[in-house]
């Protein structure tokens, strides 16, 4: 007998298939694409800072780095600062951590959730710096750069995910503790940005991790919007108080 392939039937069958999802509701995808894009962007920006004389490190940092005194006038700095780095070691550590954490988290959370955790953690880091800086002090004019706030948000997300699945969290707790000590004791390290990223990353990832199974997408979207609005509101309030 000869079989006849019905094109329309095949299309309907494919359309009716449900997208495979991870345990936390993210779409199953191959590879950590967002992680690779974020690492690539940071590396390219740093290469521009170093290799092209016209795009000097100081020029990019002054235009895109976070400075509390300029935040209300140039709000893009809250996020663009996360794509700049001060030196090779700064870039190397952050990109290594992003590569390792992103490679583990992105497949579990899904691309859009992972992206939101990363960007909101970066915003949270800048917001914490903003609130803990004062016009009467040098901190108000201090330039801050780096993806560390976002990376600390990923540390927090890793802790949340491991707790959600009942896994041992002692390793990630020890790693965060070591980095926290370095943040507080090291020179020219913004512990405020690290703390802000850690807190926001934990909140956002907890929303994703413990959202009711039947309402994961709705709760995830609502929670993401709520956190973003809260951070913007805090930034606006700080601007009014300064």
Residue ranges of each PLM-predicted region?
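C-terminal transmembrane module of polytopic alpha-helical membrane proteins
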Residues: 1-27, 184-242
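N-terminal TM1-TM2 helical hairpin plus the immediately adjacent luminal interfacial "cap"
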Residues: 31-145, 184-192
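Central hydrophobic cores of alpha-helical transmembrane segments
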Residues: 119-121, 171-180, 220-228
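Alpha-helical membrane-inserting segments
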Residues: 44, 48, 124, 128, ...
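Perimembrane helix-loop junctions in membrane proteins
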Residues: 53-57, 137, 165, 212, ...
């Amino acid at each position: 007998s000869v079989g006849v392939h019905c094109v329309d039937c095949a299309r309907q069958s494919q359309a009716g298939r449900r997208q495979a999802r991870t345990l936390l509701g993210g779409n199953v995808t191959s590879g950590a694409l967002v992680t690779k894009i974020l690492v690539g962007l940071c590396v390219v920006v740093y290469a521009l800072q170093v290799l092209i004389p016209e795009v000097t490190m100081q020029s990019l940092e002054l235009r895109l780095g976070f400075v509390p005194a300029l935040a209300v006038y140039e709000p893009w700095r809250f996020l663009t600062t996360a794509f700049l780095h001060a030196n090779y070691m700064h870039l190397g550590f952050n990109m290594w951590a992003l590569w390792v954490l992103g490679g583990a988290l992105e497949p579990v959370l899904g691309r859009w959730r992972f992206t939101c955790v990363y960007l909101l953690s970066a915003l949270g880091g800048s917001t914490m710096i903003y609130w803990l800086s004062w016009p009467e002090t040098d901190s108000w004019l201090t330039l801050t750069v780096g993806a560390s706030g976002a990376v600390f948000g990923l540390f927090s997300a890793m802790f949340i995910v491991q707790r959600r699945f009942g896994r041992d969290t002692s390793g990630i707790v020890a790693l965060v503790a070591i980095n926290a000590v370095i943040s507080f004791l090291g020179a020219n390290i913004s512990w405020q940005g690290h703390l802000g990223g850690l807190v926001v990353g934990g909140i956002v990832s907890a929303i994703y991790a413990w959202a009711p199974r039947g309402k994961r997408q709705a709760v995830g979207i609502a929670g993401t919007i709520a956190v973003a609005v809260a951070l913007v509101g805090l930034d606006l309030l700080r601007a009014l108080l300064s």
